[in-house]
Amino acid sequence: MAGILADDSRPAEHVVADLAMGGQALGKFANRLPALVPPWNRIAPHLVRFLPEIGIRGLSTIGARTREVPIRGLRQNNVHIDVIDWRGKRTGTARGFLGSDFIINEVVSHLHARRTGGADAGEATGLMTHHADMDDAMFEFVTELVNRTRAHPAVVWQRASEVFSCS
């Protein structure tokens, strides 16, 4: 399937056909979740309206969502924090780990914004991971974050089917 970027200049029907074909291929697997995480977590806004027509019920991009349900039949929940410094602007190393302190501060900032009206309180705080690009330190951080927060009574880790109401 060709990349579907925010600046994809192909006709919408070609992009939607690629998405539908990909969805059909994924449909051959058990427990398929009808949700889309587009390449680089970006999709051209004019394509979103076609997603429910091809069976996609959930969408995740990067940054704050504008609406929980951008179009009838589609629920959106985005990621807000990336573990990788892709261009090396913060760490000095392209594709480097942003570090535990930085990521925890970002998580706390997003949670604070949710509680004080600065972010959509109904949108789960999303952490973006990249299994193919992560090193041991990144995997260890994510594992420790999940394990430590899972034990806290105020934390609820949700399944993707819950986040996108596809259960």
What would you call each of these model-derived segments?
Residues 1-49, 68-70, 81-90, 127:
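Metal-dependent polysaccharide deacetylase catalytic core of the NodB/CE4 family, i.e.
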Residues 4, 11, 15, 96-103, ...:
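Residue-level preference for long, well-ordered alpha-helices that form the structural scaffold
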Residues 18-19, 100-110, 139-145:
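Well-ordered, non-membrane alpha-helical segments in soluble/globular domains
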Residues 21-28, 109-117, 148:
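A generic secondary-structure signal
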Residues 25, 29, 50-54, 144-152:
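Alpha-helical structural signal in soluble globular domains
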Residues 38-118:
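Active-site-adjacent pocket scaffolds in enzyme catalytic domains
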